[in-house]
Swiss-Prot record:
The gene is CPK11. This is Calcium-dependent protein kinase 11. GO terms for cellular component: cytoplasm; membrane; nucleus. It catalyses: L-seryl-[protein] + ATP = O-phospho-L-seryl-[protein] + ADP + H(+); L-threonyl-[protein] + ATP = O-phospho-L-threonyl-[protein] + ADP + H(+). Residues 113-371 form the Protein kinase domain. The keyword Calcium applies. Residues 377-407 are annotated as: Autoinhibitory domain. The keyword Nucleotide-binding applies.
Length: 576
């Protein structure tokens, strides 16, 4: 049994990450290093810093500290105030003439590439298929509209992500950046195309896997973390969705994507800004005093899910999840854990130690007997229940959001009394859309005392099509009182909207068309149906539809979790 324990220089053979989807404002005193020249292998030094004009907003963000003082206690910084995600403010104009901060090549993107179909729509950018004219090779092109870059921090975030992608260039499991282009209206990033799907989706499609296969995936994940840390990069948003396969073949490399929250760090440096995703965030992030150890925690959560199909810290609300992250016990007694090897449990336990000083480092985790090449992970197939749970965990019920929108648009003026005027009050520029800033201003006007992170969560829950704004239909759907939603005639009308052929069932084809109509892309239709379909006939009948609409009744957040209990936009605006 060989222990193929690699060091920083060799870690480049085991890793992954890239894509531009989400940015976190960066303080003025933390300017990112300059863009390094392209390289075929990872550099062992961070690029030299460049001078970037300070932002007028930076005084509101104290994101990093070099003072290793005692962390703020959980009592002083309640977990339920932590931001699971940070959204960029919608903007009307750019604060910098050039985002890339260099002389842009005279060649334009369209001179070199043919732009093809849309691959995905993110919060702040659209990804297209693009084909290199000279070679016919396919790539992914992410287009970021400059009008959405409102603050200097927004501009710096884009620059920093590009810098980090170049800094990690050459790593076998990090999505490669091919080039960055800029014109008068957008920044375009051309990247390696990952057409093989997400990590969990691949496992679900295959229908079976073993501890040994899980250990191989864990080795890739931890290997990327070690490579990032050795090059002075902290990812800060590790989760299964950020791991994609290049192609559908069995031997496809796994690539890490999305460095939108990543940041350069120095040894001993600590950070305070709360970033990440609820299930995967480390406890010290919620306590606002953390370092690179947070990435190991997130990887430990992913490995726990790979082995059991459920997250280690679970609750029906984000507040509850955060409380579990801070205080909850690890469950190794429920199924399937009695059948999982002791070595696997030992690794997960050591990666999920709450004290970051006692937690395994990425290098130590990579050297663990369960993870290392030819290690002790058994080849015995994992219980089929793990796959079933994994499928449930990965699926997100988007049908309910679409149905609420349909019901909202069918209501009479009397039924939505007051909501129309409320929308007009919030939509101060009469654009027909409520921006994040308008929502914040409106909530303050009605006396709602909410943190930015809570307003971000409300915005995300209401913004069905991920456009970054709330249109009238989305607003009504988000603020409706539940007694209107549960009326029989409204439910039947909504069901009939999706049941185009009047068969009495919503089929996969009908749901696919509905997703296209609502601008909801990158969706596994069979998973949405499977989450609702109780008799396993592959379609949704009226009774199943009604039960879905009446169950929970709180807005769904990312990864299928309920966002914040029964608290939603209606409550925030004091409409309920």
């Amino acid at each position: 049994m060989g222990n193929n324990c690699v060091g920083p220089s060799a870690a480049g053979q085991n890793g992954f990450f890239a894509n531009v989807a989400l940015w976190r404002p960066r303080p003025a005193d933390a300017a990112p290093p300059a863009l390094p020249p392209p390289s075929s292998a990872p550099s062992d030094q961070a690029p030299e810093p460049v001078t970037i004009p300070p932002s007028e907003h930076s005084s509101h963000h104290s994101s990093r500290s070099t003072d290793p003082s005692t962390p703020t206690s959980a009592a002083e910084q309640p977990a339920n105030k932590a931001a699971p995600k940070v959204k960029r403010v919608q903007s009307a104009g750019l604060l910098a003439d050039s985002v890339l901060k260099r002389d842009v090549n005279t060649a334009r993107l369209k001179d070199l590439y043919t732009i093809g179909k849309k691959l995905g729509q993110g919060q702040f950018g659209t990804t297209y298929l693009c084909v290199e004219k000279a070679t016919g090779r396919e790539f992914a092109c992410k287009s970021i509209a400059k009008r959405k870059l409102l603050t200097q921090e927004d501009v710096e975030d884009v620059r920093r992500e590009i810098q980090i992608m170049h800094h990690l260039a050459g790593h076998a499991n990090v999505v490669s950046i091919v080039g960055a282009y800029e014109d008068a209206v957008a920044v375009q990033l051309v990247m390696e195309l990952c057409a093989g799907g997400e990590l969990f989706d691949r496992i679900i499609q295959r229908g079976h896997y073993s501890e040994k296969a899980a250990a191989q995936l864990a080795r890739v994940i931890v290997g990327v973390i070690e490579a990032c840390h050795s090059l002075g990069v902290m990812h800060r948003d590790l989760k299964p969705e950020n791991f994609l396969f290049i192609h559908q073949k069995e031997d496809s490399p796994l690539k890490a994507i999305d460095f939108g929250l990543s940041i350069f760090f120095k040894p001993g440096e600590t950070f305070t800004d709360v970033v990440g995703s609820p299930y995967y965030v480390a406890p010290e992030v919620l306590m606002k005093h953390y370092g690179r150890e947070v990435d190991v925690w997130s990887a430990g959560v992913i490995i726990y899910i790979l082995l059991s199909g459920v997250p280690p810290f679970w609750d029906e609300s984000e507040q509850g999840i955060f409380e579990q992250v801070l205080k909850g016990d690890l469950d190794f007694s429920s199924e399937p854990w009695p059948n999982i090897s002791e070595s696997a449990k030992d690794l997960v336990r050591k990666m999920l130690i709450r004290d970051p000083k006692k937690r395994l480092t990425a290098h130590e985790a990579l050297c663990h007997p369960w993870v290392c090449v030819d290690g002790v992970a058994p080849d015995k197939p994992l219980d089929s229940a793990v796959l079933s749970r994994l499928k449930q965990f990965s699926a997100m019920n988007k049908l309910k959001k679409m149905a609420l929108r349909v019901i909202a648009e069918s209501l009479s003026e009397e039924e939505i009394a007051g909501l129309k005027e409320m929308f007009k009050m919030l939509d101060t520029d009469n654009s027909g859309h409520i921006t994040l800033e308008e929502l914040k201003t409106g909530l303050q006007r009605v006396g709602a005392n909410l943190m930015d992170s809570e307003i971000d969560a409300l915005m995300e829950a209401a913004d069905i099509d991920n456009s970054g704004t709330i249109d009238y239909g989305e607003f009504i759907a988000a603020t409706l009182h539940i007694n209107k939603v549960e009326k029989e005639d409204k439910l039947f009308a909504a069901f009939s909207y999706f049941d185009k052929d009047g068969s009495g069932y919503i089929t996969q084809d009908e749901l696919q068309k509905a997703c296209e109509e609502f601008g909801i892309g990158d969706t596994r239709i069979e998973d949405i149906i499977g989450d609702i379909d109780q008799d396993n006939d592959g379609r949704i009948d009226y009774n199943e539809f009604v039960e879905m609409m009446q169950k929970g009744n709180n807005a769904m957040g990312k990864m299928g979790q309920h966002s914040t209990g029964n608290f939603g936009l209606g409550e925030a605006l004091k409409l309920r």
